[in-house]
Amino acid sequence: MYLCYMQATMDILELKSFLDEKVLQYNNPNFIESDPVQIPHLFTLKEDAEIVGFLAATIAWGNRKMIINNAKKMVTLMGSSPYDFVMTHKEHHLEPLENFVHRTFNGGDFATFIKALKHIYLNHNGLEGVFAAHQQNDSLQPAINQFKKVFFEIEHQNRTQKHVSDPLAGSAAKRINMYLRWMIRNDNAGVDLGLWKTISPAALSCPLDVHSGNVARKLGILLRKQNDARALAELDAQLRLMDATDPVKYDFALFGLGVFEGF
């Protein structure tokens, strides 16, 4: 067992019990009002929800209010009909996107993403289809790598590639793992949407960021100091010991402890 701050009083079963309680505390509809997951909840059509979810997750770094506001701007720029916009847009429809900016994600990146999404729906059976085609039983990280290759089969600027992380290149791929959690987990708790039925939640990886990483280290379930792909594999292994069928539910506990409780 890992050496940890709480080891003297908390074994793995006690830790699981503690984190299970925190999952129940944070994995409920109250979580949505301050989280970007609210963006895909605005839509009922699967394709609409998965498109805006992907875009919202892509810009999910920085201030959460700013993320949510800018994601809503993206929805407005797509005429509040994202799937229709992606599939039927002409070049001149992309011009209003030019002034969009969130941190380093700009209007040119946004336009490229629209074109890439159309390519995926036309030629690769949609977003779920790409990930399902390349999934492995115990990990979606190789599927993320393949998704990035497919996504950038269209003409694009090299700078735009940085907005889709690649775990096989060492990234923890926090934002895309968060997006996959939204799309795949379906526990009827009202937060994650569970729209994708062809991929098991058992294959998901935790969206590892500064909050979840720091809490995991304090709990002794993560030793590596960098938040990278190796740290993610280490954390995933520990979370699967507590629940192999739904390991990423513990993201709610780790994130909630870090953000809301200052753990």
What are these regions (language model features)?
Residues 2-263:
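HhH-family (HhH-GPD) DNA N-glycosylase catalytic core used in base-excision repair
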